[in-house]
Amino acid sequence: CADRMSVIIEIPNEASLKLLAPEKDHESVYRPMGYIQQGVLESAEERKKHRHAPRFVPAGQSTQMIVGATGESDRDILYLSSALYGRPTMRRVYYSGYVAVNTYDPRLPALKQPPLVRENRLYQADWLMRFYQFKVEEIVDETHPDLDLEVDPKLAWALRHPEQFPVDVNRAEYERILRVPGIGV
């Protein structure tokens, strides 16, 4: 039995997906995600009745998004990730910087290099949401819809919120200490 199941979202926005792959739609992605979630929840109910009942994908589900192929902002991507993490069985969202492999299809953008720093910043922001309880709007907002490629998202937040510092680590709550750049779990 599989430990985790993954359904690939591919492109974060339905309109962009239609632009690059008109034959695909997000419904064909979200429907299987729903089936997996239903299977996990039914399995959990069955285990309440029968302790040795087999677990269905015990590590939950994951998905992946390609970033940089279309014009979505990091804010759009992180809001989608946050919504996915709100599902009871979603454990991990992976981000993959777009790499042009088919240069003959005019629908696909021709980038000089993959957006690897952006991909890394999205992983850092994802970590802040999952383990540090940051909200999307604390990481990116309308005035800063994309992550700063020069500094990590936690430092960028700290620079935008000087009123939060200094922090007395002997008296501050754990959650506040975790927001200090350089301190982590």
Task: Give, region by region, the residue ranges found by the protein language model.
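Conserved alpha/beta core segments of nucleic-acid transaction machinery
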Residues: E142-E173
